[in-house]
Swiss-Prot record:
The lineage of its organism: Bacteria, Pseudomonadati, Pseudomonadota, Gammaproteobacteria, Legionellales. Mn(2+) binds at residues 186, 205, 242. This is Phosphoenolpyruvate carboxykinase (ATP). Pathway: Carbohydrate biosynthesis; gluconeogenesis. GO terms for biological process: gluconeogenesis. Involved in the gluconeogenesis. Catalyzes the conversion of oxaloacetate (OAA) to phosphoenolpyruvate (PEP) through direct phosphoryl transfer between the nucleoside triphosphate and OAA. It catalyses: oxaloacetate + ATP = phosphoenolpyruvate + ADP + CO2. Binds 1 Mn(2+) ion per subunit. It comes from Coxiella burnetii (strain CbuK_Q154). Keywords: ATP-binding, Cytoplasm, Decarboxylase, Gluconeogenesis, Lyase, Manganese, Metal-binding, Nucleotide-binding. It holds the Pfam family PEPCK_ATP. The keyword Cytoplasm applies.
Length: 517
């Protein structure tokens, strides 16, 4: 176990104690909700250009190196790790012993060492607090977080004044100059996404919940497309809102908490999230008024305002943080072109095609420096920034799991219809999408009459309880059918161009869109 020398060391403080320290240290203030409110300066989202993975003998042939998984030498990592240790040795540090992964076979013990008390609270909220000594002899991973230490690109071999470095061989993750706490959870997500596939576990960027009878649903999607909102269902039990593993026998949460977007949060539309933001939670970059009341509509700090809270703040939750293999898998796509249906039933090959494509939109992007507003993107596996191995590794595991369980996969458009974004189209309302999801989870959607949507070759239902029939076929929602066809053809061409980079069996390639006719 890594020994940490510091001026003062606080070990395994309770959330209450960490909140007291954070307020006393001037790291944040208590809001009217009871949640701790903090700000993170210029870094209000992830910094993908500042994220590196150590390239060594173990990882050289296993990681898909490039702009997402940037390589860094062991020597460069070691020098910065030592600099961070020296920096922290002159300060008070906070240490918590946690774990990631709710499955006894696949969890990782985790030692979190932070300069800020609120970063340690974030780790306690988002990771899993084990009961007793639960390491079972497993070697522990170590997170070192020194947001007050800045990097020098020339001296430290990095790109800016901050860096995230993941050392998969040494089980170390380093954060320097990174006040945005979301970096911590996504770094450990990347670690599990690297480690689990050789153990026949599919890691997934998805939310998961369970019905009264134990039936499990998975919601894949990028930030802002509806994972957290749709999985926080008043009639179902939450497993988790963002990161899960799918083994041969179960679905299990990687985390012990939720990290919800707060922009335009409404008590009426999202009561479970609203009520979870209370004492013990953290509000990150949420604007407060002079009375400490949060204004969730105020985006002056960022569109990516967040709340971190433990699963215990959600009354309807699966206690053991896991469930059986899924009965339904939903790919949430936010279509800005307004040409995809609100729901489609996918074959196994189509599931692999749309999983690899990961077509969606960046809605209030989680990345620093992103363009304000909304832009479309193809994000492999519905989470390209977090998957270190080649994408086909994950796609093959997905097909294997679908084949073994026979679960139905659905494509659900939470984006626009009747026209494109900014060109007369309207976004599907949350109640409409919830009705679609309810129809999926009832099992009735796949039993009713269907038709095929030309061009995309998608099987779509002719009716769904609680949804206007005319919304189900996107071609019928456009006033000008020829304008729909032209826009659909344009998107189909984008799909084809994006898919050229994948080396996959013909059956998967042919499951994609063809020309509109």
């Amino acid at each position: 176990m890594e020994q940490i020398a510091a001026r003062v060391t606080y070990i395994n403080l309770s959330p209450d104690e960490l909140i007291q320290h954070a307020v006393k240290n001037g790291e944040g203030v208590l809001s009217s909700t009871g949640a701790l409110a903090v700000t993170t300066g210029k870094r209000t989202g992830r910094s993908p250009k500042d994220r590196f993975i150590v390239k060594d003998e173990q990882t050289a042939d296993q990681v898909a190196w490039g702009n997402i998984n940037q390589p860094v030498e062991q020597r460069t990592f070691d020098q910065l790790w030592e600099r961070a240790l020296r920096y922290l040795s002159e300060r008070a540090v906070y240490i918590s012993h946690l774990q990631v992964g709710a499955d006894d076979n696949y969890f990782l013990p985790l030692k979190v060492v932070t300069e800020f008390a609120w970063h340690n609270l974030f780790a306690c909220d988002l990771f899993i607090r084990p009961s007793g000594d639960h390491a079972n002899g497993k070697p522990s991973w170590v997170i070192l977080s020194a947001p007050g230490l800045k990097t020098d690109p020339e001296r430290d071999g990095v790109n800016s004044d901050g860096a995230v470095m993941i050392n998969l061989s040494q089980r170390r993750v380093l954060f320097v100059g990174m006040p945005y706490a979301g970096e911590m959870k996504k770094a450990m997500f990347s670690v599990l996404n690297y480690l689990l596939p050789p153990h026949d576990v599919l890691p997934m960027h998805c939310a998961a919940n369970a019905g009264q009878s134990g039936d499990v649903a998975l919601f894949f999607g990028l930030s802002g497309t509806g994972k957290t909102t749709l999985s926080a269902d008043p009639h179902r039990f939450l497993i988790g809102d963002d990161e899960h593993g799918w083994s041969a026998t179960s679905v299990f949460n990687f985390e012990g908490g939720c990290y919800a977007k707060c922009i335009d949060l409404s008590q009426e539309r999202e009561p479970m999230i609203w009520n979870a933001i209370r004492h013990g939670a953290i509000m990150e970059n949420v604007v407060l008024d002079e009375n400490g009341v949060p204004d969730y509509a105020d985006a002056r700090l960022t569109q990516n305002s967040r709340a971190a809270y433990p699963r215990e703040h959600i009354p309807l939750r699966v206690e053991n943080n896991r469930g059986r293999p899924p009965d339904a898998v939903l790919f949430l796509t936010c279509d800005l072109d307004g040409v995809l249906p609100p729901v489609a039933l996918l074959t196994k090959e189509q599931a692999a095609y749309y999983f690899l494509s990961g077509y969606t939109a960046l809605v209030g992007s989680t990345e620093v420096g992103s363009v304000k507003g909304v832009t479309s993107t193809f994000s492999t596996c519905f989470g390209a920034p977090f998957f270190p191995r080649p994408p086909t590794v994950y796609a093959e595991l997905l097909m294997k799991r679908i084949e073994a369980t026979g679960c139905q996969v659905y494509l659900v458009n939470t984006g626009w219809t009747g026209g494109a974004y900014g060109e007369g189209g309207e976004r599907f309302s949350i109640p409409t999408t919830r009705a679609i999801v309810n129809a999926v989870l009832s099992g009735k959607l796949k039993e009713g009459p269907t038709e095929v949507l030309s061009g995309f070759n998608l099987t779509i239902p002719k009716s769904a309880l609680g949804v206007d029939d005319h919304l189900l076929n996107p071609r019928k929602t456009w006033e000008d059918v020829s304008a729909y066809d032209a826009r659909a053809q344009r998107l189909i061409q984008k799909f084809r161009e994006n898919f050229e980079k994948f080396k996959v069996p013909a059956a998967i390639r042919e499951a994609g869109p063809s020309d509109v006719h």
